[in-house]
Amino acid sequence: MGAMPVLLFVLGVGSSAASSFGEVAAHRPVVSHHLGTFNGKHVQYTATVEGIDVPDAKGNPAARVVSFSYTDDNPHDSASRPVMFVFNGGPITASLWLHLGIMGPKRVSIPDDLSADPSTYKLVDNVYSPLDVADLVFIDPASTGFSRVLPGTSPESYFSVSADAQQVTAFISTWLMQHGRLSSPAYLLGESYGTIRAAEVAAQLAELPHPILLKGVALMGEAINIVEYRQRQQNIVSYAVSLPTLAALAWYHNKVVRKDKTLEQFVQEAWRFAQTEYLTALFKGNSIDAAERDRIAQRLEEYSGIPAAYYREHDLRITKERYRGELLKDRGLLLGRNDGRYVAPMTDKGLAEDPSSVITVGFKRFFTDYLRKDLDVDWPDEYVVLKEVGLEEWKWGGSGPFADWPYGDRLLKVMKANPRFRVLIGNGYEDTQTTVGAAAYAVRQAGWPEGRARLSFYEGGHMAYTVERSAKMFTDDVRTLIGASWPAQLAR
C-alpha cells in the first residue's frame, strides 16, 4: 500500500531515552480537574492518564496500554452518558493527532494562510470538542505513546489487523468494566488505518463471550476499502474513484474553468462523469476508438487540469502520486500528499518531502507542554508518536492471489447484531491518500442496511479538521452520530 505512507517521527518527552516497561508500569494514574466550554456548554471534567494491563488472544498478560480520558464530573446519569474511544492509524501511531487536532479539550489552531510559519500556530481551547455530549478516551496502542508490551511479548506480535484490534478490544472491555461503564452507550472514532482497526474492534467486541454492542463508529479518512486506493494499472475502479479528488485539487489551485461552481458542485459533476463515461472508457481498454478516447481525454482535462495529451499518451490514466507532480509542474511545485492544498518546490530529482507535513510541526511542539502544564504528567518516559512498521511487515488478513480484505463486512456483522448501530464516514476533499470518491464507493458497495451510514466531506486533507470550518462540521457530525436524530446521507 505504497500510496499511504506514514508520518515518520518520534516526539521525545523528558530528557531520558525510552524507558523500560517496568518504569512505565510503576506510574500511578495522573488525575487533574478542569473546566471548559464545548459547543456553548460549560463542563467540569476530570482528565485521567492511566495504564491498563491487557491480555493477548490466549489470555496471557501482554501489554500495558496507557490512555488519556476526559469524563464529565456532573453527568445527568453516568451510566447512560456516552463514551467514545478514539485512536489514530499508522498502522501504529499514537492518538496525538485526534487528541490535539479536534477531539480533546485543547486543539492546535492552524491559520487559513497555508504559507504561515509553524511558529504562528497556537494551542487554544477547543470549543468544538464533543465533551459536551460524551466522555472521551484516547488510546495509544502498545509501542506508541506511553504504552508498552510486557516482558516476554514481542512488539511484532501485534503487527496484524486481528492482533492489533484484539489489544484495543481488550482495553475497551477492561476500561468499561473498571470504570463501571458497561451500560454506557459506547462509540469508536478511528482515523486512516484506525478506520480498519475500528471496524475490526467493533466486530471483536460483538464476538466477546459477553458481547459489547457499540452504538456507532466514526471513520475519519476511511480506508476500509483499501484496495481502491492502490492504483495498479488494471484496477480501473481506483482511477474512477480518484477523479473527484483530482477535480477538487484542480478547482482549489485554479487550474480548471470553475464555471461559477462551488467546490462541492464541481466535485459532484466530476464524480458523475467518473462513474459513467470515464469508467466505461477505462473498461474498454485498448478497444476504445480514437474519437471516444480523444473526447474522454478532453473531459478529463476539464476536470483535472491535466492536458488531454497526457491522458491520450497514458491510457486515460494518471495516478494520484503522479498528479501531485504534474498539476503545478509549470511552476515547479509539488502538491502535498496528506493535504494537496499545500505546495512546495520540487528538487532536481523531482522529489520533495510532503509539503503538508508542515502541519505536524505544531503538534510536536505543543504536546509536550500540554502533558506537563495541563495534565500534570511529568514522566521521564519517551512518548513515542509512531512505531516505525513497514507496511510489508503488517499482516493485513489475506494471503495468496485469491485473498480478500473485507473490512467493511466486519461492520455489516455488527449492524446485523445491533439494529441501532450506525456509521459516520468523513473524508477531506483534498486528501490524496484516502479519497472522497473511494469513500462514496465503499458505502455503495458495503451492503449496509439503508439509513445506517452517513457520508460527510470536508474542506481539507487527511486531517481536514485542521481547517476551522471543517473542525466545526466534523464535530457537529460526531454529535449527530451520538445524538437521537440521524439524518443518514448515503453516497450520491
Residue map of PLM features:
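Alpha/beta-hydrolase fold catalytic core
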Residues: 281-433
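Alpha/beta-hydrolase active-site loop
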Residues: 131, 141, 158-176
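Catalytic histidine-centered segment of alpha/beta-hydrolase-like enzymes
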Residues: 461-471
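Short alpha-helix in the alpha/beta-hydrolase fold that links the catalytic acid
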Residues: 421, 435-445
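N-terminal cap/lid subdomain of alpha/beta-hydrolase-fold enzymes
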Residues: 19, 59-157, 444
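Alpha/beta-hydrolase fold nucleophile elbow
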Residues: 181-193
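Catalytic histidine neighborhood in serine/cysteine hydrolases
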Residues: 447-463
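A catalytic-pocket lid/entrance helix-loop region that shapes and gates access to the active site
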Residues: 107-109, 206-291, 295-299
